[in-house]
Design a protein with these regions (language model features):
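Divalent metal-coordination and catalytic microenvironments
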Residues: 13, 31, 53, 64, ...
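Active-site mouth loops of central-metabolism enzymes
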Residues: 63-75, 136-147, 189, 246-247
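Active-site metal-binding motif and surrounding structural segment of the metallo-beta-lactamase
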Residues: 39-56
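Metal-associated gating/positioning segment near the N- to mid-region
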Residues: 51-129
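N-terminal metal-binding scaffold of metallo-dependent hydrolase/deaminase domains
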Residues: 1-44
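Histidine/acidic residue-rich metal-binding segments in metalloenzymes
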Residues: 147-166, 170-341, 346, 360
């Protein structure tokens, strides 16, 4: 019996799944993968794409992005979702507080009274995604108040939101006045109240109660202690970019992982924990300890920390790390200690340009830079092409695992029949020295500029339709067509319905991870230099 004509056939490619690579064709019908088959056995298709012998991956599921952080959500999504499509992204995990979901008027600096229920802001956020986005997107709410924590079951049922972030940098700010300068950076990013451990515990209780795919995200970085290091560095006259790394040394990240892993394990039901931008060897040791104690914990990192050293010149949170941590991070990604890669994309300021943003004195430099365009070039050039990870491992950490941890497995993250027909075709041998013509974000600049990367996306397909491509006459990837992204609600379901990403590696703690490489347990070399500095 002959099969109905396909909408799209992708041929002459090597299809990559987490378990292997296959010379096989992909058939698409009604936006879904209809079949994987030898090309000679595929039905006729209305349209055919020739992959030209390149790898065909599932579309990237980028689990952390912050459009709307510093400018109105709809304004940011119009440009940044195009940049995401050009980077091979088909699904974006947008993380936002209630003040940054498109409600009007937009307030550049928020106050406590602006922090309201997500019931009031969700409709505008959903409408923005459905009307202007070039990628599909789901929401991770950044919670601040006890009231929001108590409303989690309602958010799950009515909004389809099952992931919740706790921005621990704002811990200790709950009692501060709106005009307290210490709280200004967070209020500039839309966080008006700050959190305390009581709110953290309430959120963990609620997520443990609702079950899969409910999950708690945390940003592990102890800014209360970072303040002390900043005072010492300033007193020592340090203004170089490496001072931002020394301000927030490795143990401040690891300490939060230990503390909040313990709290998660004490929560009735043992809430699953998702650790964003893990970057240090000490952090990986804490992840392994938490797993050994029975906690379901997932570790994420991002392209900037897999490639850029402080001397490349910028400041982000958590900071860029030095070479020994970058090498350890690649080992952790390969070993299964780190499960997911997410871009943490944000365009820091508006208007933004390299000239406006740059300042050689780190304390005067503006925080943040766009990151989504780093995603595949870093993983391919620094990872696959240097034999640090396999192409299958790239699919696991950037497609499969983020779909599983976010509750989208079965729809996103694979090219198995029944999944959305989201794909990115990559040329692993395309070598490019990055210039402005390769940057698609509205910032118009990147720390990638002037550096050469070997391996690039050349075509992005969302639900069977091309959304971006590197045409023969184009200097780089460019968006194609009108926005067709959709909001992705999630729902609760039994864990046995999915292949759980919760097989984070239960590997034995070998000599590689059982002790610190550094001179003093818990302190990196850069930290050690500043433990004795006194304020003048």
């Amino acid at each position: 019996m002959s099969m109905e004509k396909l909408d799209l056939a992708v041929k002459n490619g090597i299809v990559v799944l987490g378990g292997g690579r296959y010379r096989i064709g992909i058939g698409v019908k009604d936006g879904k993968v209809a079949l994987l088959a030898p090309e000679e056995m595929m039905p006729e298709a209305k349209e055919t794409i020739d992959a030209k012998g390149n790898y065909v991956l599932p579309g990237i599921v980028d689990s952390e992005a912050h459009p709307g952080c510093y400018v109105p959500f709809d304004y940011d999504m119009k440009t940044e979702s195009k940049a995401a499509a050009c980077a091979g992204i088909t699904t974006w995990g947008i993380q936002a507080p209630t003040t940054r979901l498109g409600t009007k008027p937009f307030k550049e600096v928020v106050s406590k009274s602006d922090v309201v229920s997500f019931n009031k802001t969700f409709p505008s956020g959903k409408e923005v995604i459905n009307s202007v986005s070039h990628v599909d997107a789901y929401l991770t709410y950044m919670l601040e108040t006890d009231e929001q924590a108590h409303e989690i079951p309602q958010y799950v049922e009515e909004h389809g939101v099952t992931s919740y972030k706790l921005y621990l940098q704002t811990r200790g700010m709950k009692g501060m006045a709106d005009d307290d300068d210490t709280n200004w950076p967070s209020r500039r990013a839309g966080l008006g109240t700050g959190i305390d451990d009581g709110t953290v515990f309430l959120v963990m209780e609620q997520i443990a109660y609702i079950g899969y795919p409910g999950i708690v995200h945390i940003h592990p970085e102890n800014w209360e202690i970072a303040r002390i290091f900043e005072e010492r560095l300033r007193a020592a006259g340090r203004t170089d970019f490496g001072a931002w790394t020394d301000r927030s040394p490795d143990f401040l990240e690891a300490q939060h992982i230990r503390a909040y892993s313990y709290l998660a394990n004490q929560t009735p039901g043992h809430v699953p924990l998702y650790l964003q931008h893990c970057t240090t060897k000490l952090s990986f040791e804490e992840v392994l300890k938490a797993r050994a104690e029975g906690l379901e914990v997932y570790a994420q990192t991002g392209p900037p920390w897999l490639w850029a050293e402080p001397e490349y010149g910028w400041r982000i949170n958590v900071p860029l790390r030095r070479r020994e941590n970058i090498d350890a991070l690649w080992r952790a990604l390969a070993d299964g200690i780190v499960d997911v890669v997410g871009s943490d994309h944000v365009v820091g300021w508006e208007p933004s340009s390299y000239a406006e943003m740059y300042n050689p004195k780190i304390w005067d430099c503006r925080t943040g830079f766009s990151r989504v365009e780093l995603f595949l070039p870093v993983l391919l050039s620094e990872g696959v092409n240097k034999n640090r990870i396999s192409i299958e491992r790239l699919v696991q950490v950037s497609c499969e695992n983020p779909a599983k941890t976010s509750g989208l497995w079965g729809q996103k993250g694979s090219l198995l029949p029944g999944f959305d027909a989201d794909m990115v075709i990559i040329d692993v041998n395309r070598e490019v020295k990055v210039g402005k013509e390769h940057i698609n974000t509205r910032s118009g600049w990147s720390i990638m500029e002037g550096h050469t990367f070997n391996g690039w996306p050349i075509k992005t397909i969302l639900r069977g339709k091309v959304t971006a491509e590197w045409a023969d006459d184009s200097p780089g990837m460019r968006p194609v067509g009108e926005p067709r992204g959709s909001y992705l609600p999630r729902k609760l379901r039994p864990k046995n319905e999915v292949v759980n990403a919760g097989s984070p590696a239960r590997i034995a703690v070998t000599d590689r991870w059982e002790k610190s490489d550094f001179d003093r347990p818990g302190f990196s070399k850069e930290t050690l230099r500043y433990t004795e500095i006194k304020n003048t």
